[in-house]
From Swiss-Prot:
Gene assigned in the entry: rps7
Annotated family: Belongs to the universal ribosomal protein uS7 family.
One CC-aspect GO term: small ribosomal subunit
Molecular functions per Gene Ontology: rRNA binding; structural constituent of ribosome
Name of the molecule in the record: Small ribosomal subunit protein uS7
Ribosomal protein as UniProt keyword: yes
InterPro entries per UniProt: Ribosomal_uS7 (IPR000235), Ribosomal_uS7_arc (IPR026018), Ribosomal_uS7_CS (IPR020606), Ribosomal_uS7_dom (IPR023798), Ribosomal_uS7_dom_sf (IPR036823), Ribosomal_uS7_euk/arc (IPR005716)
Keywords, ordered alphabetically: Ribonucleoprotein, Ribosomal protein, RNA-binding, rRNA-binding
Domain of life: Archaea
Task of the protein: One of the primary rRNA binding proteins, it binds directly to 16S rRNA where it nucleates assembly of the head domain of the 30S subunit. Is located at the subunit interface close to the decoding center.
Gene3D superfamilies: Ribosomal protein S7 domain
Length: 205
């Protein structure tokens, strides 16, 4: 970022305004916002052309908060083991899914992704505590970083389950999951998982 905060420096005397940087050469980062104040710090919307940081955050605590949120979705898609390391496959899945989202909704796919994460992020969960040799489950608030992690996991799992033993390609499944989650639709796997976790937490208060 340049010292004036007006653009990104590409070298001496060369700057690019953020509104000129488009994800995949198509989608603008301008106007994309996070409505949930607790998640703003952990959803990285810094403009990038190509969401690939090469794992530079790996050895820093909480470094994943600096990874572009689109890349974090790609990383979640590189699971289970048979998909490990297939970043280009995940890249193509997300790129195609974003095209489908735009054709179906007319909205910026980056904003749809952010809404889906906000709606899918559980606010309460349960943890185990032991008193006198007896284990209890108690309700706890979920840290913002974990809320984002859980939301991305649910979205990726929902797309993967939809595409398993199904002629519908995973790109369409991911687009559908993101659209439904952004609307808060209970047909979304991510929304159902969030509500189930919060229901169990409520009963454990």
């Amino acid at each position: 970022m340049s010292g004036q905060g007006t653009g990104f420096s590409l070298g001496e005397g060369v700057e690019v305004r953020p509104d000129k940087i488009r994800l995949f050469g198509k989608w603008s980062w301008v106007g994309v916002e996070v409505r949930d104040p607790s998640l703003k710090r952990y959803i990285n919307l810094k403009p990038v052309w190509l969401p690939h940081t090469g794992g530079r955050h790996e050895k820093r605590r909480f470094g994943k908060a600096e990874v572009p949120i689109v890349e974090r979705l790609m990383n979640k898609l590189m699971r289970p083991g048979r998909n490990g390391g297939k970043k280009h496959l995940a890249y193509n899945i997300v790129k195609t899914a974003f095209d489908i989202i735009y054709f179906e909704t007319g909205e910026n796919p980056i904003q749809v992704l952010v809404k889906a994460i906000e709606n899918s992020a559980p606010r309460e969960d349960t943890t185990k505590i032991t008193y006198g040799g007896i284990t209890y489950r108690v309700s706890v608030d979920v840290a913002p970083q974990r809320r984002v992690d859980q939301a991305l996991k649910f979205i990726a799992d929902g797309a993967r389950q939809c595409a398993f033993n199904n002629p519908k390609p995973i790109e369409e499944c991911l687009a559908e999951e993101l659209i439904l989650a952004a609307r808060g639709d209970p047909r979304s796997y991510a929304i159902r998982q969030k509500e189930e976790i919060e229901r169990i937490a409520l009963s454990s208060r």
